[in-house]
Amino acid sequence: GKLSRGLGDVYKRQILKRARSVTKNYDAFTDAANDYFIKGKGDLYDVKKKLYLSMINVNILEGLRFYVSFACTFAFGELKKMEGSAKIVSLIARDEAQHLALTTHIIKNWDNNDDKDMKKIAKECEGDIVDMFEQCVAEEKAWAKHLMKDGSIIGLNERLLGDYVEFIANKRIKALGFEPLYNLSLIHISEPTRQLA
């Protein structure tokens, strides 16, 4: 009824808010590629730059986004609750790990002179990359806050999930050759949860 519609609207707003930062680089790339290859406008360097940022976006999508939700789902699974969902999400996480490895490999090849423009673009985009990671971390933390607004659940809380997201972000950005963004100790994060990262 009316209550479920209201809750649905809240979740839709939260999801749409998170989706905007996911899609903006893809949209910019497809627009630039369409302009250059179909309409004959723009320049190839701009297309490559937008491709590079889109690949970084895929890397973040596959390796950092939704990890708050993953952690919650796996916590339920460890408690023998919602085991079917936990199994399905584990398959999704495995698939995302493969995509993460692939995008990391592509980005590292570009950074190592696979394409002279891409190496230059990588250097130019360092600030953008850090901003993209920080934005994703902020959005994941906001999602954790939203999920935990009524209190902690199944041994998880907003702080723990926030630290976990920072831990994963550090791991992912280091794999791309950057310094860690966050200074934190993870004594309170369980080994199974660390392994997910």
Please report, for each region that a protein language model flagged, where it lies by residue:
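Alpha-helical bundle segments that constitute or directly flank the non-heme di-iron/ferroxidase center
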Residues: L51-F76, Q98-L102
